[in-house]
Amino acid sequence: MRVFITLSFISMLISCQVNYSFTGGQFSGAQNFSVNYLKPQTALASPAYCQQLTEGLKDYLLAQSPLKLVTQNGDLQYEGSIVEYSVVPIAAQGNEVASLSRLSITVKIKYTNQLEKELNFEKTFTKYADFPAGQDLFSVQADLWSAINDQLIQEIYNSSVGNW
């Protein structure tokens, strides 16, 4: 009888399984993903920026998920475009001159989950970064792009597979 109880207990322990993910990703059984080049739909969005955002999204998905990157027709598919790229003054000084400017970028993303169609979406994501108005945009552009991309990519990930 003790052998039976011991074997039953060991069997229960072995059959217990806990799945935990530090990234919170839910991949619906997907094995791979594809990211199409995010196209500029506004005159100010440079192809270099679009390429940087596209590659950043690929890199983030590779680092944060068990999925493999494929060139097209992935189980999870990302495509989209840059629909707004603007610089506006945001903080006026006493002499009616702006002390800060804001670079704002809006991306429209179409996410397709080939395995669970009800998770598909098309959304816009907007993020921005501020910089001193006296600085030339081109001198701070790389840092602004990096800061904005980090936020955009995190939000796209959370909306698609992060269950947020």
Labelled PLM ranges:
Residues M1-C16:
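Sec-dependent bacterial lipoprotein signal peptides
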Residues F9-I10, G25-Q31, E79-I82, Y128-A129:
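Short hydrophobic/aromatic-rich motifs at helix boundaries and adjacent loops
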Residues A63-K68, D75-N120, Y128-S139, D150:
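Surface-exposed short loop/turn segments
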